[in-house]
Amino acid sequence: MKTFCIASALAVSLCLATFASAQSKNNYSDPKTWLCRPGGKDACDADLTTTIVAANGDLTVEKFATDPNAPIDCFYVYPTVSTDPTPNSDMTPDPAELNVIRQQFARFTSKCRPYAPLYRQVTLAGLLTAIPRATGLVGNPFASGVQYDDVRDAWNYYLEHDNNGRGFVLIAHSQGAFIATELIRREIEGKPVQSRMVSAILLGTSIHVPAGKNVGGT
């Protein structure tokens, strides 16, 4: 089926969203749909032992170890890194998606149980057309479409099958932070699960709060 779009960034964005929303849902009970889960031989399974260089030149090796008994969970939504040529990525992780886990998230496994779903993000190629450039257009460009739906479905699976009442931290960057912000707004804020949210580390985006306040509101 052909979809005809006018030649504007906004129209192309809407077409991509329509295309993405027609795709089938992921089954997040399948371990292959997760880049990281507790105890898995996956993208978080990395030796992050570090050599610390003191001001006087002394070297100290700091051994890295995960904590399988960590008291909280971390749920991570990674940034725009997919090199797939399509508007949205597929469910086969490319090297960039694996690398960003190691660079940004794996170290958190020393403090929390890791959960990082693979999701069909808007790719680097898709960004050329997926973000509206119209003057005055505001809002969250990733708040609808398969990229959001995947993360929401993974989150709901995690809550139902893995959380078991534990505290959690949301960690996200760039596109992931936009999605996580919307996830908080729709699925967490004002609901019982909010009491379990320890923190949200949302990098590469901004959060609106009520005038005169420094907390509250998404």
Predicted features and spans:
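Surface cap/lid and interfacial helix-loop subdomains adjacent to catalytic sites
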Residues: 150-164, 185-218
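Gly/Ala-rich beta-loop-alpha elbow adjacent to hydrolase catalytic centers
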Residues: 172, 176, 180
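N-terminal module-boundary/linker segments of secreted carbohydrate-active enzymes
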Residues: 23-61
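Short, well-ordered amphipathic alpha-helices
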Residues: 101, 179-188
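Bacterial N-terminal signal peptides
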Residues: 7-17
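Active-site catalytic motif of lipid deacylating hydrolases and related acyltransferases
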Residues: 32, 38-40, 67-70, 76-167
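Sec/Tat signal peptide C-region and signal peptidase I cleavage site
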Residues: 18-22
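Positively charged n-region of N-terminal signal peptides that target proteins for export
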Residues: 1-4
